[in-house]
UniProtKB/Swiss-Prot annotation:
Gene name of this polypeptide: ilvC
Positions that bind substrate: S414
Species: Haemophilus influenzae (strain 86-028NP)
Enzyme class, spelled out: oxidoreductase
Enzyme Commission (EC) number: 1.1.1.86
Pfam families reported in the protein's UniProt record: KARI_C (PF01450), KARI_N (PF07991)
Identification of the protein by name: Ketol-acid reductoisomerase (NADP(+))
Length: 492
């Protein structure tokens, strides 16, 4: 199999990268009706598999789970999750032949095996679904021509997909139809109904492409969403301890700091996050963000280039073939970092203290979001997609660090995201330690920024620069569709 994106000519590549249309709510008037009365079989019962299935069942759809015989016989976690929630469970041979829609929600590295196993069992003119297009775009999987291939990609972890649905809301979602597999022209109707069944239509749906979803998703998770948070956590903790701060306090400031500051990001973008600072701290955070951009800009664009060319996916798949040797080594090394082993702090840190004592962290968030967004847009990805894969998902990933530090983040995200995270953070961490940390000033991290005389013109220009960055302009528009977003912070 060959990388699908690399088989396209330039015009086709640009067309696929630029597929991005925010769908009107009226387009979902039929909600999930197109799939009602049809048999839907989900392969895989992890976080996305279980929680999407629960939502779809509650929306009136017929859901069952196809698992491997050994998973059933040994009553593995996937079997227990499905049966404990009252779902019908069977083998591929028992359930796939009668399915109208088979939804593959297994990890990326299992997709080719799943396709090889289920495709011969699928009935003529049925449909096959993904929630991430890596297998189609990067692996180049070819699906039988009578089968319709669609994607519904919630822009949140599976647990959040369920929680928002239970609130009567949903999470922003990308949908797509594979242009090589839409024989009856029903792909969009299937994808819309599936998205509605998960609740996504209530938060906003982008009609995208497999290509745009994959390239933007990989870029976001490798850089700002995971890689920057990991690199930032490590260098900020080490700096605080080196400055004589209580290691327990330093650990808590970092662990819960990302979540607290990105909660403001979620509600009002970079503008609101920066507005939580004093004027003196805001000017300093802006200055630090520009320095971080200068140091790390090349790395963001290198990751984007490697994703577009297919170099990243080829490198990762080589590690798959090598038994995930690099992935496991990097995972072990992360577990040994000082931040991961910081003692527990029982004291209280107020919400505002996370902002006042975390100016460098805020600068890292600002620089990282803007760099990731700019790199995606410069590569032909539309602003809406770039926003969802950078700023929008950041509070959700920060929330995982608040639970159990970097370990939890790397457990919750996919192996694909984890591998990309390490590629980025392994390079970014020493750069930040060498070029940014030694030049910090009093008040950049661990204590409030001293008040300085404020020049009105400078403050005006900085505020204008913050508010007029393209990620802020598109973010203000898209957040208008998500006015019911709840707070997710667990900090205390």
């Amino acid at each position: 199999m060959a990388n699908y994106f690399n088989t396209l000519n330039l015009r086709q590549k640009l067309d696929q990268l630029g597929r991005c249309r925010f769908m009107d709510r009226e387009e979902f008037a039929d909600e999930a009706n197109f799939l009602k009365g049809k048999k839907i079989v989900i392969v895989g019962c992890g976080a996305q598999g279980l929680n999407q299935g629960l939502n779809m069942r509650d929306s009136g759809l017929d859901i069952s789970y196809a698992l491997r015989p050994e998973a059933i016989a040994e009553k593995r976690a996937s079997f227990q999750r499905a049966t404990e929630n009252g779902f019908k469970v069977g083998t591929y041979e028992e359930l796939i032949p009668t399915a109208d829609l088979v939804v593959n929600l297994t990890p990326d590295k299992q997709h080719s095996k799943v396709v090889a196993d289920v495709m011969p069992l699928m009935k003529k003119d049925s449909a096959f679904g993904y929630s991430h297009g890596f297998n189609i775009v990067e692996v180049g999987e070819e699906i039988r021509k009578d089968i319709t291939v669609v994607m519904v990609a919630p822009k949140c972890p599976g647990t959040e997909v369920r929680e928002e649905y239970k609130r009567g809301f949903g999470v922003p979602t990308l949908i797509a139809v594979h242009p090589e597999n839409d024989p009856k022209g029903e792909g969009l109707a299937i994808a819309k109904a599936w998205a509605a069944a998960t609740g996504g239509h209530k938060a906003g749906v982008l009609e995208s492409s497999f290509v745009a979803e994959v390239k933007s998703d990989l870029m976001g998770e490798q850089t700002i969403l995971c890689g920057m948070l990991q690199a930032g956590s490590i260098v900020c903790y080490d700096k605080l301890v080196a400055d004589g701060k209580d290691p327990a306090y330093a650990g808590k400031l970092i662990q819960y700091g990302w979540e607290t500051i990105t909660e403001a990001l979620k509600q009002g973008g970079i503008t609101l996050m920066m507005d939580r600072l004093s004027n003196s701290a805001k000017l300093r955070a802006f200055e630090l963000a520009e320095q971080i951009k200068e140091s790390l800009g090349f790395l963001y664009y290198k990751h984007m280039d490697d994703i577009i060319s297919g170099h990243f996916s080829a490198t990762m798949m080589a590690d798959w073939a090598n038994g995930d040797k690099d992935l496991f080594a990097w995972r072990e090394a992360t577990g040994k970092t000082a931040f991961e082993n910081a003692p527990k702090y029982d004291g209280k840190i107020s919400e505002q203290e996370y902002f006042d004592n975390g100016v460098l962290m805020i600068a890292m968030v600002k620089a990282g979001v803007e760099l990731a967004f700019d790199a995606m847009v410069a590569s032909g990805i539309y602003e809406e997609s770039a926003y969802y894969e950078s700023l929008h998902e950041l509070p959700l990933i920060a929330n995982t660090i608040a639970r159990k530090r970097l370990y939890e983040m790397n457990v919750v995200i996919s192996d694909t995201a984890e591998y990309g995270n390490y590629l980025f953070s392994n390079v970014a961490t020493p750069i930040l330690a060498k070029e940014i940390i030694p030049n910090l000033q009093k008040g950049d991290l661990g204590e409030p920024t001293p008040a300085v005389e404020i020049d009105n013109i400078t403050l005006r220009d900085v505020n204008d620069a913050i508010r007029n960055h393209p990620v802020e302009l598109i973010g203000q528009e898209l957040r208008g569709y998500m006015t019911d977003m709840k707070r997710i912070a667990v900090a205390g």
